Amino acid sequence: MLNCIYAISAGHEKTLEIAESILKEGGNAFDAAIAAHLAMYLTEPCMASAGAGGFALCHHVEHGTMMLDFFTQTPLSSRMDFDPDFRSILVNFGNESEEFHIGLASMATPGSVDGMFKLYERFASMPFEDIIAPVQDLARIGLAINKFQSIDIGLLEDIFASDPSVNDIFFNSGQILREGDHFILPHFSDFLDLLRYEGRDGFYLDYPARQIEKVCKENGGFLSRKDFESYTSRWVKVLEIPFKGFNVILPNLPCVGGLTMALLLKTYQEKGEDWLRAIYDFKACNYNFTQLAQAFSHTFPGQLKPTDSDSNFNRGTSHFNIMDKYGNAIALTCTLGEGSGYFIPGTDMQMNNMLGEAFLVPQGFHKWTPDTRLNSMMTPTMVKDKNRRLRFICGSGGAGRIPYMISQMIHSSVIRDMKLEDAMMDPRIYLYANAVQYETGYKGNIEIGLAHKEWKDLSLFFGGVHAIKINEDNSVEAEGDPRRFGAASIGYE
């Protein structure tokens, strides 16, 4: 028996509190996950929304471990018989600036709402109205902007400014919201009522879908009601990779992060357990999507799910983990991209800009394959021991760095058996911009003939690996990564 009745780690303290309230009411991990994900639309509006998508690893004590794919889908039609609303925007991340594209023609079909109802139908134990009750309470009162929210909203200020309908929400007297400012989505509670009374169809068949079709037809977007009507999230078999006496459970396609992490872990063992050499050699392969899938299938035959996608990147990600007293667990990662700058009227829900990220459409803008799942580096992860016991649950934000940071975290916490708090603070390493990037105190090899950049302060550059650890003696640890201002909680009888 576990020594606790629940454990949670998340990217925002209010997300955590919502999940905690459901578990205290007797709900299971999946009930809590639905509530937590919906709460993220308010607590982490730069990363989550009804207009977003994601992936979840779900471990059920009776039904095993499976992946829920509720990621975004390209529109059914790529016809260019209109002038697309598609404009570039430069986002300054501090150590780098990057160009993205927003507008109606950047929007892919979202999966978040459908995914939550798929999860509800399969594993929920509480009535839906009880699950969303604490989220509605939070929606009515709002919250104070925390430091990480302030950073994110500030980075994306120009995107929020592009839709006049939300100026009063994200700006205060013409200034973008800052830490400590009150934040509320005035229509969010009504939107939750729509889901409560009309379910999944309230979003995919009713007003939101009709409104998006109308604005796209009139102003230059690809999405139509048929895109929403045909969308479905799906359950997928997970990948299972042996690693130093444990089995690492990873998401299958379209999560290319799972393939990347599997091959990285194998390379790490082949390169004398040198993270820098493993990262360098793996990156030197410079796999495109097809080559990555072929390399994985050659190394781990018989596991890969067929897919017709060919992209491999995401920014703007967030993650949470929940484990309940029954032993059920979920690791869920979601993304909005940077956001399209279009908010569905009357909902305060921003649509994604997945078709505006160059890495997600390698063939070129407006040249994507219609009706196709986009791929992602999001990598919700679990680890089981040789007796098939769940021992570790984690995930991270951090775009293309996600599988590299999670791999190092698993090695520190699971293989080296460090206390989770110590493993969380264990310095990490990465290769970027032709330089070895490492945190102060990193004890491994840093020499590979490239320039060095030492990071003396914690930075979200090295991910945000929120995690839960189940020790051999059934004691449980939970930590939110301070690099992304994470939060964690463990409940006891």
Residue positions per predicted region:
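Short, small/polar residue-rich loop motifs at catalytic or cofactor-binding pockets
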Residues: 235, 314-317, 376-378
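Extended C-terminal regions of large enzymes
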Residues: 250-254, 259, 383-401, 413
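Internal maturation/activation junctions in enzymes
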Residues: 263-335, 346-347, 452, 458
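Active-site rim segments in enzyme catalytic domains, especially the processed small/beta chain
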Residues: 42-49, 53-68, 222-224, 328-392, ...
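Noncatalytic scaffold domains of N-terminal-nucleophile
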Residues: 1-24, 29-199, 203-205, 209-244, ...
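Amphipathic alpha-helical
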Residues: 204-230, 288-309, 326, 339-343
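Extended C-terminal subregions enriched in glycine
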Residues: 291, 295-298, 326, 372, ...
